[in-house]
């Protein structure tokens, strides 16, 4: 998750705030929706689509 966030920040320096939010989102999804995390192969991928 951190690596993806770092790459995103490098690609889009202007959207540093979005990168910070995207880094926090995966942890929330994993804790709140364990069932969805099991169905999704990679929670960060879902966040990336959003």
From Swiss-Prot:
User: GO molecular function, one example?
Assistant: serine-type endopeptidase inhibitor activity
Keywords, sorted A to Z = Protease inhibitor, Serine protease inhibitor
Pfam (any one): amfpi-1
Q: Where is the composition biased (Polar residues)?
A: 8-25
Q: Which residues cross the membrane?
A: none
Q: Which InterPro entries match?
A: FPI1, Ser_Fungal_Prot_Inhib_sf
Q: Where is this region: Disordered?
A: 1-27
Induction statement: By infection.
Function (record text): Inhibits trypsin and the toxin protease PR2 of M.anisopliae. Does not inhibit chymotrypsin, subtilisin Carlsberg, proteinase K, porcine pancreatic elastase and the toxin protease PR1 of M.anisopliae.
Name this polypeptide is given = Inducible serine protease inhibitor 1
Name the source organism: Galleria mellonella (Greater wax moth)
Biological classification of the source: Eukaryota, Metazoa, Ecdysozoa, Arthropoda, Hexapoda
């Amino acid at each position: 998750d951190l690596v993806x966030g770092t790459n995103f920040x490098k690609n889009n320096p202007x959207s540093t705030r979005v990168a910070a939010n995207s880094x926090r989102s995966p942890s929330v999804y994993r804790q709140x929706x364990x069932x969805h995390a099991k169905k999704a192969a990679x929670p960060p991928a879902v966040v990336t689509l959003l």
